[in-house]
Amino acid sequence: MSQKDTQQEHAERANPVHEQDNAPRIAVVTDSAASLDPKLVQRLSARGNFVLVPMPVTIRTPGEPDRQLQDLTAAEVDEAIMLAHVMGQTVSTSGPAPGMFADVYDDLASRGFTHVVSVHLSSELSGTVEAARTGARLSRLGSEGVSVVDTRTVAGAYGHAVVRALEVLNSASAGSSVECPSPGYSTPNYPNPDYPTAAQLVDYIQSICEQSTLYFYIPTLDALRRGGRVSPALAMVGQMLQIKPIGTITEGKLTYVERPRTAARALERLVEVTVQTCRDQRHAAALTSAAAPEMNPSPACFSLKATPRGEVVAVHHVGNAAQAVQLYEQVQQMLGESSLVHDTADSSAPEVLVSALPPVLSAHSGLGAVALVVY
């Protein structure tokens, strides 16, 4: 069976409650910078209402053909990028072309989807959002049929929002319940006879992203310098002072939280700032819950409310998976909780998303990087 036939079969199984004519059907599109594990992507794609668009990564050597990395395994990518940095080769990244997005949107339209929610990394870090918007205008659905979301963040900080949005769609299409809280309630599930609108889904995704915080550790500024993310002067100073930065994303841009001088101290502080953010979110949620008036939930309501729990929801690494998971477990221990890491292959939506950073991000972070996402 060809890949196109397989996609068609998946599409026919997607959203079974809405197979009648003129019924709304929503698909979700994202890019590889969402940092979703390949096994999870395969499982999410099985319903036919999800597409991940790859982002090209190229190693350039003068006098030699460019080398593309997207078809390599995670281990091969780590090795290729490490060798490229050692040999002084240029590792370049780029967003998908508008035509690629237009083709994806057209394919989804041909399979009966009436709207696409296209979710992408911060426009401050990449031209992907603009390419998606241009692709929407070129597609059969047009700008009216494609909602492009500028998440203003990166990696699992929006990757987990994509997973949660798909959970909502798939639960609604299966006729089961989704989170439908009235004011003062944050956990109960009620029967949901309706299907979310694209606008509701966009608001839900944006709310999750706004309330998610990503912290990352990179062992050297050199990879960021090669990718043009920091100036050569700053990278040189960082190398001279042996700076091991801890960073985050603020208003869509890369910013630094601290600049420790040793790897051990940097990793220690990464855990500490992550724990503090978890505690701050939990405290804020408790205050909000205490201040909310007591109201009886209505079984007929349909509402999507993003409610952060002050937990680590994603863990990323570049060639150091064991270390990344160990840091996550340290966070859990300091919070007095057990680890929630599961094998991605065993669940369509694991409680904690653990994945290698994709080439489009690892090219800039370098080997040994770690990232933790709190929501």
Give residue ranges: language-model regions.
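Short beta->alpha junction loops
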Residues: 95-96, 150-152
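Short beta-strand segments
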Residues: 29-30, 118-122, 373
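Class I S-adenosyl-L-methionine
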Residues: 62-118, 123-138
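Actinobacteria-biased recognition of intrinsically disordered, low-complexity terminal regions
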Residues: 1-23, 177, 183-186
